[in-house]
């Protein structure tokens, strides 16, 4: 699988990860516009790989609450997939726990159910940090991506190893 990640080529700081400029994503309008561009690019690239017979399992798109609230994400995703000739097994969607906080939670949950019905894989990214709750395991999630803070150096950290095993056993 491939994951569509966004990086900013800053003129003085070089390549900057999205995590280092979260204030951009606090503006829902800007976040939604960026989300549309990233989704379109990722799906276009996946279609090109299919056309060129490049083997890949799926491309995963990280989405924000703004994508669901302002972009009608499930409907737009279905339309773009059809336009690019992509099947549900070619596309994954990644969400984080922050999307389920506040007044956008209902829109996000409804949208996730729609995406799940389409047959696209839904992953819960960075699970185990922040406000993650066992209640999140009841969401229409196909895959948990345990946060790297638990898996980095796991072979030397029995506590983190036990936590990861417990999550996997769930």
What do the predicted segments below correspond to?
Residues 46-50, 81-82, 109-119, 165-169:
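Surface-exposed amphipathic alpha-helices with a cationic face
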Residues 86, 116-120, 139-146:
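Glycine-enriched alpha-helix->loop->beta-strand junction motifs that scaffold or abut catalytic
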Residues 2-3, 30-107:
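Catalytic core of bacterial c-di-GMP phosphodiesterases, primarily the EAL and HD-GYP domains
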Residues 8-10, 67-79, 99-110, 127-170:
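Bacterial c-di-GMP phosphodiesterase catalytic domain signature
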Residues 1-23, 42, 142-144:
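A short, well-structured catalytic beta-strand-centered motif of the EAL phosphodiesterase domain
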Residues 21, 38, 61, 93, ...:
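Conserved, mostly hydrophobic/aromatic
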Residues 19-26, 32, 109-113, 161:
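Conserved long alpha-helical elements within nucleotide-processing catalytic cores of c-di-GMP signaling
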Residues 14-18, 27, 124-136:
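Catalytic-site-adjacent helices and loops of nucleotide signaling machinery
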């Amino acid at each position: 699988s491939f994951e569509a990640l966004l990086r900013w080529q800053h003129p003085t700081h070089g390549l900057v990860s999205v995590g280092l400029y979260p204030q951009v994503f606090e503006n829902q309008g800007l976040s939604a516009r960026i989300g549309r561009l990233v989704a379109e690019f990722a799906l276009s690239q996946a279609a090109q790989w299919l056309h060129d017979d490049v083997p890949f399992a799926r491309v995963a798109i990280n989405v924000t609450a703004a994508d669901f609230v302002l972009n009608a994400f499930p409907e737009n995703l279905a339309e773009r997939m059809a336009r690019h000739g992509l099947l549900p097994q070619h596309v994954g969607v990644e969400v984080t726990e922050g999307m389920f906080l506040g007044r956008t939670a209902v829109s996000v949950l409804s949208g996730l159910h729609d995406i799940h019905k389409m047959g696209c894989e839904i992953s819960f990214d960075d699970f185990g940090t922040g406000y993650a709750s066992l209640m999140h395991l009841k969401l229409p999630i196909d895959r948990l991506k345990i946060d790297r803070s638990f898996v980095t150096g796991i072979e030397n950290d029995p506590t983190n190893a036990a936590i990861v095993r417990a999550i996997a056993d769930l």
